[in-house]
A protein has these predicted regions:
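An alpha-helical, amphipathic repeat domain used for nucleic-acid recognition
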Residues: 1-208
């Protein structure tokens, strides 16, 4: 059986290179070496080498997934798409998804709440537009409908969007402001009742 003849650190990485019978064989994380109690002189069967390679790949691609999640929360579909772009096998992708779900890093319900909160704070949009966005993220229709019903008030969001946008229309007269603001709110996916209320609120000052 092949024998470990050297374990050498990689440059600029918390990983080690494993040499079998004097030749480089594969790289593994320092943590995996500790877990598997690998040391120079150990004999490794081909089956053991394959298992180490599989565990190493899982750790390596999990680290990639964690980095992807570090920028912002992700939907399950977003993570699947990301892993597929990295040419990761279906079996390994399933293992990564399972681990991330168990660790609560992937949860479409939590993702939906986060997405709606971000939209409400920074870019208010109507239910139709939000529905389309969440569908693109791979969320199921029942989940989308439930979360939108619970979390979204079109009237409040349209009013918030209108108050923010009207500031950029200062140089226009009231008629032109109304035309532009109406067009903007419709493009943001708001229904007519919410649009009408927002127009009255910011232009006719019927609602403060």
């Amino acid at each position: 059986m092949p024998r470990i003849t050297a374990i050498k650190p990689q440059k600029k990485s918390n990983r080690r290179n494993i040499y079998l019978d004097g030749r480089f064989a594969f790289g593994v994380s320092t943590m995996l070496i500790v877990k598997e109690k690998l040391k120079v002189g150990d004999e490794l069967s081909l089956e053991k080498v394959k298992k180490l390679s599989d565990k190493n790949n899982l750790e390596k691609y999990l680290d990639m997934a964690y980095r992807y999640l570090s920028y912002r929360p992700r939907s399950i579909k977003e993570m699947v798409d990301y892993l597929q772009k990295k040419k990761i096998s279906t079996l390994l992708t399933e293992k990564i998804l399972l681990k991330l779900k168990k660790q609560r890093y992937l949860d479409d319900l939590k993702f939906a709440y986060w997405w709606l909160d971000q939209r409400a704070r920074f870019r208010p949009r109507g239910k139709f537009a939000l529905t389309m966005e969440l569908r693109e993220k791979g969320l199921k229709n029942d989940l989308i409908k439930s979360v939108l019903t619970e979390k979204v008030s079109e009237e409040e969001l349209s009013l918030k969007a209108a108050r923010k946008k009207i500031k950029s229309y200062r140089r226009f007269d009231k008629k032109e402001k109304k035309k532009k603001l109406k067009s903007f709110l419709v493009r943001q996916g708001f229904g007519w009742p919410a649009v009408k209320m927002a127009l009255e609120a910011v232009l006719d000052k019927k609602i403060i």
